[in-house]
């Protein structure tokens, strides 16, 4: 099995139920072709680079899964036929190295306060004429 990523853009005015219906259809295709569904992320509504079907914004969804070529063909066919989907793209990531998820460490509040206090406490040079 190969690893794939698919990003698809939905119309921005869809209800949560409509978004769930589209996501369920995609997951059904993956499971019916004995694929391994790994992750679905909703990236939210973002501005498009150019209008698509008179929509300036779109809801981005990211999907990661394992499967075969037949599954990709069927998945893309169903996305193409769905009027709620503005655009989609699938990418084979089998040979791509796994990137570890890096979480940002919160800066302690005390350290920020000390840095800002030092900046305020530093006297300014005076210029005399």
UniProtKB/Swiss-Prot annotation:
The protein's GO terms of the molecular function aspect are:
small ribosomal subunit rRNA binding; structural constituent of ribosome
The protein's superkingdom reads Bacteria
Disulfide bridge map: none
A GO CC annotation given for this chain: cytosolic small ribosomal subunit
Against Pfam families, the record matches this protein to:
Ribosomal_S6
Keyword RNA-binding assigned:
yes
The answer to keyword Ribonucleoprotein applying to this record is: yes
Q: What does this protein do?
A: Binds together with bS18 to 16S ribosomal RNA.
Cited HAMAP family: Ribosomal_bS6 (MF_00360)
Q: Which family does it belong to?
A: Belongs to the bacterial ribosomal protein bS6 family.
Q: What protein name is recorded for this chain?
A: Small ribosomal subunit protein bS6
Q: Which organism is it from?
A: Pelobacter propionicus (strain DSM 2379 / NBRC 103807 / OttBd1)
